[in-house]
A protein has these predicted regions:
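Catalytic cores of peptidoglycan-degrading enzymes
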Residues: 73-202
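A short, compositionally biased
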Residues: 1-2, 177
Length: 202
């Protein structure tokens, strides 16, 4: 087991031990990706850095809001076509692991908020992720939705669980319409499917 120090909202720290199991990750080979998103030209590097700074800023604020405690539902119904942690090869080129869950869905399909929160980023065209939406669920836990064709909410607005927030697309580094749902707790990646399994959604 590993030992963790947990800081509670009232300022006290709790030391707990939890078993941590090994996990095997798949390898996914994706062909037909726009080549400019596999090996970006030099003139795009500044844009990529600027995009990254926007995402970091959107995830930076840590509030005392506890929207995440109501639990999470799937943001869309559809088969899972990409899993968290899989090693990705794009057009045969090895890249970073995939830190989200991909759901196959037609372009224009409705995406709903998996939990309540505040919209921290609503950008229609980031280089890698295309139409991108980030929702803050409180205490540094956030959801990101990538490759969107349209965004239905604005930055600073509050959404409730089940609200329509965006439409599925194939923008950015993508080969076809799908939703890429990602989660972060501060600067730590989180598998969204684990949150679905562990937090109450009823």
């Amino acid at each position: 087991p590993s030992t963790f120090i947990i800081s509670t909202p009232n300022g006290t720290d709790i030391e707990e031990q939890y078993p941590v199991a090994e996990r095997e990750y798949k390898i996914q080979r994706v062909e037909g990706v726009p080549q400019k998103t596999v090996k970006p030209p030099a003139e795009q590097l500044q844009r990529i850095r600027s995009d990254s700074a926007l995402v970091v800023k959107a995830r930076k604020e840590v509030t005392s809001v506890t929207d995440f405690l109501e639990g999470f539902i799937k943001p869309i119904d559809g088969p899972v076509t990409g899993v968290y942690g899989s090693q990705r090869f794009y057009n045969g080129v090895p890249k970073s692991p995939h830190y989200g869950v991909d759901y196959a869905a037609p372009k224009g399909a409705n995406v709903i908020a998996p939990a309540a929160g505040v919209v921290r980023l609503a950008h229609r065209d980031l280089f890698y992720s295309g139409g991108t939406l980030i929702i803050d669920h409180g205490h540094g836990l956030s959801s990101s939705f990538l490759h969107l064709s349209d965004i239905l909410v604005s930055e600073g607005s509050r959404v409730e669980r089940g609200d329509s927030i965006a439409l599925v697309g194939s923008t950015g580094r993508s080969t076809g319409p799908h939703l890429d749902w990602r989660m972060n707790w501060r600067n730590v990646r989180v598998d969204p499917e684990l949150v679905l399994e562990t937090l109450p959604a009823q």
